[in-house]
Regions:
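C-terminal motif of bacterial Sec signal peptides marking the signal peptidase cleavage site
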Residues: 16-18
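Aromatic-rich carbohydrate-binding modules that target alpha-glucans
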Residues: 32-74, 82-111
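Extracytoplasmic
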Residues: 64, 72-76, 95-123, 129, ...
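Acidic/polar, glycine-enriched structural segments that form the non-catalytic walls/loops
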Residues: 154-277, 357-369, 373-380, 439-441, ...
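Aromatic-rich carbohydrate-recognition surfaces in CAZymes
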Residues: 216, 276-394, 421-429, 539-561, ...
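Non-catalytic carbohydrate-binding regions of carbohydrate-active enzymes
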Residues: 442-478, 507-666
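Beta-strand-rich modules
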Residues: 777-795
Length: 959
C-alpha cells in the first residue's frame, strides 16, 4: 500500500461519525514494501550469493539498511533478490560515498555499462565497516547511500566487530612464530599457539599480520575435533591440520542452496557445500576434492554428493539413454557440450570406490559404471571429433572465458565448444579407463571397447597436444579447419596427464622442470592474459597446487614438491583459511593495483572464498597422502610417505616424529608414526622409506632412510612485480585483429598488432613471425584467416577472431519464417519440431570435404551460464535419401535479442554434381535432465528447452 493511500484512509476517519474513538479500534496502516522479495547486496567482497550480512534489512517506509565488513579494493555488485529476478545497478560510473545515487533496473543490453554484466562498481580505500542505506519511491529505481559505519552501527550487525588478535593466544602454554617473506622484502608474521599440548582434544590459536580478504578478524581459535588429527613437535603443523579439519566440518551441511535453483530455497542433502561463499554442489569441485582425499576422510558424505550429481532424464523427454547421466553444471553458452568436463566425476568415484567395501562397494560401482557409460556414449556423439580422435569442449575448471581464452570468445562461445582442451581430454581418458575396469564385471563387450578407446585417446593426446619445443602439453587446440596448438599451458592439465599415465616418464620430468613457478607457488595458467584481472588468470589455486605436488612426487622433482608444499602451507597460514585462490606473484588473497598507481580494474582475485572445498581437499592431500603416505588405489591401505629435506628442516623442524591418528578406513582406525632424521642444512633431497611395520591394532611405524639428493629443478620466475601488467616475461601479447576483403581473384588481409604475427588460413600457417601489415593471398575455395601476436620472449597470443571469405551455399529450412531484424528472418526449431528439412536440395560444385553450420539466434540465457545450449543432429542425405554424413550442431547462447552467430560446424565429404538434402533432428541438452527441474531460468521449471531461431544452413568447401 502506497503511503499517500494510507494517509488518505486515515484522514477520512478524522471527526466523522462511525469512526471509533477508542485507540484500540483505530485502523493500523500496513507498511507493505514496494519490493516484496528479500533484497541483498550481491558481489561485495566477491560474494555473489546471499550471505546473512548482505541482506538489506527492512526498516519500514520502503527503507532498508545493512552494515558490511568490507576489504580494501574495487568491488562489483548489484542490489538483487535471491533468484536474480530483480536487479538494480548503478552502471554508468563508479559509485560514490556519502551521496544518494539512483540504482536502475539492469538494462537489456550492456552498451552503456562499465562492464560486461552491468554491475555497479565501488572502490574502498580502507577496510572496515560500511553502512548501505537503500530506499524506494517506486519500482523503477532505488536510491542508495554508502557511508562509513560508526562503532554503534557496526556492533548492531556484528557482535564481534572489534577483536584483538592477541586474545586468541591467551592462556596458551606453547607458541610458535613463523615469518613468511613477501615479494617486496617485507614479511608477514603468523603466530601459532596451543593451550595444552597434551590434551586429548587441543585448543589452538592462530593470528596473522596479513591483510585478510573480506576484512575478516586477524585471529581465530580452533578447537580440535574427534577424528583424524596430527601430533608433532611443531605447533604450526598441528594447528593448520586442525584448522583444515574444522573447515571440512563447516563444509558438511544438511542443506544446500543456489540462486539458480529452487528460488534459492534450501534443498535437503547431507553433502559438502563448495565454500564459504558457494552453498551448492558442483560436479567438478566435488570430484576433484573427493579425489584429493575427501573420499577417504568422509566416504558417506562424498558418496551422497556424487549421487546428487547424477540425473536421469525427465519423464517428458524421450530419455535417450537408459538411466542416469553425470550432470554438467550451468556454464558457458548454456553448458554441455560446450562444457564437457563432467567426466571429472569419475575421478571422485574412483577414489571413493577405493574406500568402500562389500555391498556398499557393489551398489555404488554398478551405479557409477552405468552413469559413466551413459555419459561416455553421449559425449562420443556430441563432443567427439573423429578426425582428431579428441573430445571437444572447454578447459576443465578454467571456465571464465576471457580469463584464459581470446578476448572475443565471450561473444562467440561456439569457438570454445569446438576447441579441444588437454585437461578435458585427460579426464575423459580417466573416465574411459574406469569404465573399462568396471565393465569387466558388468559388460565384457564394453570392457574391450573402452580399453581401445582409452588407448586411442592417449595416443591422440600425445600426438596433438605435446609441444616438444616447450617440453609441455599445450592447454588447448583451436579449431580453424585444422587444429592450431595454442601457446598456452595449464598446470591442472599437465599434472593430470602425468599422474594419469598419459605422459611418459621423460615427458613428465620435462613438464615439471619447464612449467613456470613463482616463489609463492605454481600458476594455474601460463603465460598470463594481458588486461585481465586476477581469477584464473595470474592465480594460484591450491587444489591445482595439490595436483602439481602429486606430479612432483611421481617424478621425484624435489624442487617442485617443496614449492607446492610451502605454497599450500603459506596460503592457509597467512589467510587463516584454505582460500579459493591467490595472486601468483605475491601469494596474496588480494592484490590492490591502485596501491602502486596501477589500474584498479585489475584488482583480484575478483572472487575468493574462504574454506573452499577443493582447497581443503588439497591441504589434506598434502598431509595425508604426501607426508604420511596413505594410499588406497588398490583398495587396501598402503603407507608410502614422501618427505623432503626442506619439509624436515622447516615445516617439521621441532619434531622428532610425527603421527597421524584416528584415520578411519573401511571400518577400522589406523595411525601412522614416522621417525624423522636429524635436521640438516641440505634442502635439496628427500628421505626414502626404509621400513614400514604395522601391529595388530593398525598402528603403522615408518623408518626413513638416508637423504637422497636428486637432480631436480623448476623454472622459477623472479623480479616481476605482481601489479605489473605488461611484462613480456610472464604475459602473452594481446591477439591481433584482422580485416579481410576479396579483391578481384585474391584476398587482402589487414593485420593489426604492435607485435610480429603468425598468419593462418584454414589452420595452415601461411606467414610466420612477420610484421603486422597487409598481406595478399589467393586461396582455393572458402578461406578462414586468423593470426597470433608474438612478443619479444617468443610467447604467442591466443588466436584472433577468424574472418572468412569465399563462395558458400545457403539453404533455408522448411517452416514458417518470422522477421528477427532488418533483412534477417528465422524459423524456430524446437524440441517438438520433429524432422526439419531443407526447403530445397543443393548440388556439390566439386568433390571434397564441406563444412555445414547453422546461422542462428539463441537468447535463452546469458553467455556465461544456463542449460539451454541448443544441440541438434544435422543429417546430410543424397538424392536416394541415404545419410552420407551427420554430426551434432551446437548453438550456444549469444546474449543478444537480435544477434546472429554461426553454430559449431560438422564436416561431410560430398561428390561433385550430386544432389543432397539436409535435415535437422532433436538431440538433448542439460535441460532434459531431472536434476534441472528446479532450475528457475529457461529449460528449468517450465520444462526442457532445446530451441534456436535459424535463418539458414551454411555450406562451405574446406579445401
Amino acid at each position: 500500500m502506497k503511503p499517500s493511500f494510507i494517509a488518505l484512509a486515515v484522514a477520512s476517519c478524522i471527526g466523522l461519525a462511525g469512526c471509533g474513538s477508542d485507540s484500540s479500534d483505530a485502523p493500523v496502516p500496513v507498511d507493505k514494501p514496494i519490493i516484496s522479495a528479500d533484497l541483498y547486496l550481491r558481489g561485495l567482497n566477491g560474494d555473489w550469493g546471499t550471505a546473512e550480512h548482505a541482506k538489506l534489512n527492512y526498516l519500514g517506509n520502503n527503507e532498508y539498511e545493512t552494515v558490511l565488513r568490507v576489504a580494501r579494493g574495487s568491488n562489483q555488485f548489484k542490489i538483487a533478490d535471491p533468484g536474480w529476478q530483480i536487479q538494480y545497478t548503478y552502471f554508468e560510473e563508479p559509485a560514490a560515498f556519502d551521496k544518494a545515487q539512483e540504482y536502475l533496473p539492469k538494462p537489456d543490453t550492456n552498451e552503456a555499462c562499465m562492464n560486461d554484466d552491468c554491475n555497479s562498481e565501488i572502490t574502498f580505500e580502507d577496510k572496515g565497516y560500511y553502512k548501505f542505506s537503500v530506499s524506494f519511491a517506486d519500482e523503477s529505481r532505488a536510491s542508495m547511500t554508502v557511508t562509513k559505519a560508526t562503532q554503534e552501527e557496526a556492533e548492531k550487525y556484528y557482535s564481534d566487530a572489534i577483536l584483538d588478535p592477541a586474545m586468541v593466544h591467551e592462556g596458551h602454554q606453547s607458541k610458535e612464530v613463523k615469518l613468511f617473506a613477501n615479494y617486496d622484502d617485507s614479511s608477514d608474521t603468523v603466530i601459532f599457539s596451543v593451550k595444552d599440548p597434551k590434551a586429548e582434544l587441543r585448543e589452538f590459536g592462530i593470528s596473522t599480520t596479513t591483510e585478510l580478504r573480506d576484512a575478516l578478524d586477524q585471529g581465530l581459535v580452533i578447537n580440535e575435533q574427534t577424528g583424524p588429527r596430527v601430533v608433532s613437535g611443531d605447533v604450526a603443523f598441528d594447528a593448520l591440520f586442525a584448522l583444515t579439519m574444522k573447515e571440512l566440518d563447516q563444509l558438511a551441511v544438511s542443506e544446500i542452496k543456489d540462486g539458480n535453483y529452487n528460488y534459492n530455497n534450501p534443498i535437503k542433502a547431507e553433502v559438502f557445500e563448495t565454500g564459504a561463499k558457494w552453498h551448492y554442489v558442483w560436479t567438478r569441485d566435488l570430484a576433484y576434492a573427493a579425489d584429493l582425499s575427501l573420499a577417504l576422510m568422509n566416504p558417506t558424505r562424498v558418496q551422497n554428493g556424487l549421487n546428487f550429481k547424477l540425473s536421469a532424464f525427465r519423464d517428458t523427454t524421450d530419455q535417450q539413454y537408459d538411466g542416469e547421466q553425470i550432470v554438467q553444471d550451468t556454464g558457458t553458452g548454456g553448458s554441455w557440450p560446450i562444457s564437457t568436463d563432467r567426466t571429472t566425476w569419475a575421478l571422485g568415484a574412483e577414489r571413493l570406490l577405493s574406500a568402500l567395501d562389500g555391498e556398499e562397494y557393489n551398489q555404488f560401482a554398478e551405479r557409477a559404471y552405468k552413469a559413466i557409460s551413459n555419459t561416455l556414449e553421449a559425449d562420443r556423439l556430441a563432443a567427439f571429433d573423429a578426425k582428431s580422435g579428441l573430445y571437444t569442449g572447454e578447459q576443465s575448471f578454467l571456465d571464465w572465458r576471457e580469463q584464459t581464452y581470446s578476448t572475443w570468445t565471450p561473444n562467440d562461445v561456439n569457438a570454445i565448444g569446438s576447441s579441444k582442451a588437454l585437461s578435458t581430454n585427460v579426464v575423459h581418458y580417466r573416465a574411459i579407463q574406469l569404465a573399462a575396469k568396471l565393465a569387466e564385471k558388468y559388460d565384457s563387450t564394453n570392457a574391450v571397447k573402452y580399453t581401445e578407446w582409452a588407448e586411442q585417446l592417449k595416443t591422440a593426446i600425445n600426438d596433438q597436444f605435446w609441444n616438444a619445443e616447450r617440453g609441455m602439453y599445450v592447454s588447448y587446440l583451436f579449431d580453424n579447419g585444422k587444429d592450431i596448438a595454442v601457446d598456452k599451458y595449464d598446470m591442472l592439465g599437465e599434472a593430470l596427464a602425468i599422474i594419469s599415465g598419459v605422459a611418459s616418464d621423460a615427458q613428465a620430468k620435462q613438464i615439471m622442470a619447464n612449467y613456470p613457478h613463482s616463489e609463492f607457488g605454481v600458476p594455474v595458467y601460463f603465460p598470463q592474459q594481458p588486461d585481465v584481472p586476477v581469477y584464473h588468470n595470474r592465480a594460484i589455486w591450491p587444489f591445482v597446487t595439490a595436483y602439481s605436488l602429486r606430479a612432483a612426487h611421481q617424478t621425484q622433482n624435489v624442487a617442485a614438491a617443496n614449492n607446492a608444499i610451502q605454497s599450500l602451507v603459506r596460503g592457509t597460514a597467512t589467510n587463516l583459511s584454505n582460500m579459493e585462490n591467490l595472486e601468483w606473484l605475491s601469494g596474496k588473497s588480494f592484490i590492490i593495483h591502485s596501491d602502486h598507481g596501477e589500474d584498479p580494474s585489475m584488482d583480484g582475485p575478483v572472487i575468493n572464498s574462504q574454506r573452499q572445498l577443493w582447497s581443503v581437499g588439497g591441504y589434506l592431500n598434502m598431509v595425508v597422502e604426501t607426508l604420511f603416505g596413505i594410499h588406497t588405489e588398490t583398495g587396501k591401505l598402503e603407507v608410502k610417505p614422501f618427505i623432503t629435506s626442506w619439509v624436515r628442516n622447516n615445516l617439521l623442524a621441532q619434531s622428532e616424529q610425527i603421527t597421524l591418528e584416528n584415520f578411519a578406513f573401511k571400518g577400522k582406525n589406523y595411525s601412522v608414526t614416522i621417525d624423522l632424521p636429524e635436521v640438516s642444512k641440505d634442502d635439496t633431497g628427500y628421505y626414502p622409506v626404509e621400513n614400514v611395520t604395522m601391529d595388530d591394532e593398525g598402528h603403522f611405524h615408518v623408518t626413513l632412510g638416508a637423504l637422497v639428493n636428486v637432480d631436480s629443478s623448476i623454472t622459477l620466475v623472479s623480479g616481476v612485480k605482481p601489479y605489473a601488467s605488461e611484462d613480456s616475461r610472464v604475459y602473452s601479447p594481446q591477439e591481433p585483429t584482422l580485416v579481410v576483403k576479396s579483391v578481384d581473384n585474391s584476398v587482402s588481409i589487414d593485420v593489426t598488432s604492435k607485435y610480429n604475427v603468425n598468419l593462418y588460413r584454414n589452420g595452415e600457417l601461411i606467414q610466420k613471425n612477420v610484421i603486422a601489415q597487409s598481406y595478399s593471398d589467393t586461396p582455393t575455395g572458402f578461406a578462414c584467416y586468423l593470426a597470433e601476436s608474438i612478443n619479444d620472449k617468443g610467447f604467442r597470443s591466443n588466436p584472433s577472431q577468424p574472418v572468412c571469405v569465399g563462395e558458400e551455399i545457403r539453404i533455408k529450412l522448411d517452416g514458417e519464417y518470422q522477421p528477427l531484424k532488418d533483412n534477417v528472418s528465422v524459423v524456430t526449431v524446437s524440441k517438438d519440431s520433429g524432422i526439419v528439412k531443407g526447403a530445397e536440395s543443393f548440388t556439390a560444385p566439386v568433390t571434397g570435404t564441406y563444412q555445414f553450420d547453422a546461422w542462428y539466434n539463441n537468447n535463452l540465457g546469458q553467455l556465461n551460464t544456463g542449460i539451454t545450449n541448443t544441440v541438434k543432429l544435422l543429417e546430410v542425405l543424397d538424392d536416394a535419401g541415404k545419410v552420407v554424413g551427420q554430426g551434432y550442431l551446437q548453438m550456444g547462447h549469444i546474449g543478444e535479442n537480435q544477434g546472429m552467430r554461426y553454430s559449431t560446424p560438422i564436416e561431410v565429404t560430398l561428390e561433385q554434381g550430386k544432389t543432397y538434402q539436409v535435415a535437422l533432428k532433436d538431440h538433448f541438452n542439460m535441460s532434459y535432465l531431472k536434476s534441472n527441474e528446479t532450475y528457475i531460468y529457461a529449460g528449468g521449471i517450465e520444462g526442457e528447452k532445446n530451441e534456436a531461431q535459424i535463418a539458414d544452413i551454411r555450406i562451405t568447401p574446406l579445401m
